[in-house]
Regions:
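Acidic-basic catalytic patches of nuclease active cores, encompassing PD-(D/E)XK
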Residues: 1-36
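Non-catalytic C-terminal interaction segments of nucleic acid-processing enzymes
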Residues: 2, 6, 20, 24, ...
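Amphipathic coiled-coil/heptad-repeat helices and related helical stalk/stem segments
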Residues: 15, 38-40, 83
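Conserved catalytic cores of phosphodiester-cleaving nucleases, focusing on short active-site segments
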Residues: 22, 44-67
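Active-site metal-binding core of divalent-cation-utilizing nuclease and nuclease-like domains
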Residues: 28-51
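Acidic carboxylate-rich catalytic motifs and surrounding loops in phosphoryl-/glycosyl-chemistry enzymes
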Residues: 33-39, 99-108
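Mg2+/Mn2+-dependent nuclease catalytic core
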Residues: 61-87
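Acidic, metal/cofactor-coordinating or nucleic-acid-engaging core segments within structured domains
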Residues: 81-101, 112-114
């Protein structure tokens, strides 16, 4: 498992920073993680009281600022299409929305966006087969990837 490597541990630390930032804005909600020692269909659930409110996929980026994400990537978030499909299935089974969390560590910002609800994508998603990094630890793979426009995402700023 990637999570057992030094780079994997950095990913775990970044997800914890994501959780703390989210919960600082929404203290009534909890970010409940899936186990990190085995593959999971999604990264977390958003829970308030005894109710599940959303399925969450979280990605953390250390290689860019918010400005670079905007200027060079046009606010397009790349997520494997398999992960998107898995999260949509989980959201349907739980009858809750699927929300994307993109934490940009150098800028200490969390972009959040509802991606899917009630059997429908909430905005256009582009699917392309591209060569991307295979895992946290490197390597490359050719696979279907989704590009999600985050330009209308909520921006939660840390240390504000």
């Amino acid at each position: 498992m990637d999570i057992l490597t030094p780079k994997g541990q950095i990913s775990v630390d970044d997800e914890q920073a994501t959780r703390r930032l989210w919960e600082s804005y929404y203290p009534d909600y909890r970010y409940i993680e899936t186990p990190k020692n085995k593959p999971a269909a999604f990264d977390a659930l958003l829970v308030k009281g005894k109710n599940i409110y959303a399925v969450v996929e979280t990605k953390c980026r250390r290689d860019m600022t918010l400005e670079k994400f905007s200027a060079e990537y046009n606010m397009q978030w790349l997520v494997t299409y398999k992960k998107i499909r898995d999260c949509c299935i989980a959201a349907d089974l739980l009858a809750v929305p699927f929300v994307g969390f993109l934490y940009i560590q150098p800028s200490n910002v969390l972009l959040t966006k509802e991606i899917y609800r009630d059997g429908m994508f909430q905005q256009h998603i582009t699917i392309e087969q591209t060569r991307t990094q295979a895992t946290t630890n490197g390597g490359y793979v050719l696979r279907d990837n989704a590009y999600i426009n985050m330009s209308q995402a909520k921006i939660l700023r840390g240390d504000a």
